Amino acid sequence: AKNLQNDSLFWGTWINNMFDYGSVRRPYGVNGAGLVTIDRRERKDAFYLYKALWNKEEPTLHITDKRRTLRDGERQAFHIYSSAGAPTLLAGADTLAVTEYATCQYRTDSVSLRGTVEIKAIAGPLRDSVTLRVGNVLKPKRLQGPRRTVNPQPTN
């Protein structure tokens, strides 16, 4: 968005679809290019980016990638969309440094997190939060030993 706003040859923006919709030609039968999910329950990150950039009447604050609450690996970085000024980002009780990299777009460097962590963004009166499980949450559990049948049947 930063490069597009400064380009004198760029003169318009179009949104292809407001909502995801069913499509026979697409994998899983869904065209996922919309700003809102097919069940209309969740707004995608692009929705909040456009809202932060274009809606000057209602301030916006949004932590991106909130739908992915299970995260593998301890190093995590966060992106925030805010039209209410520079946000303060808290990971548990720690404050994370936030830098603006484009209009209404902020990010943090990677930080080391572990376990269940609540991430909170604060910008003026606005609040947004997400609870993440970070670490080796995606690895399958190991079995204690080989499985044995209680009464094995003899085979021929």
Residue locations for each model-derived region?
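Extended substrate-binding grooves/exosites of carbohydrate-active enzymes
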Residues: A1-L96, R107-S112, T116-L126, V150-P152
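Aromatic sugar-binding surface patches on proteins
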Residues: Y101-R107
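Edge beta-strands of extracellular beta-sandwich domains
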Residues: P125-K139, Q144-P146
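Compositionally biased low-complexity segments at domain edges in trafficked proteins
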Residues: G145-N156
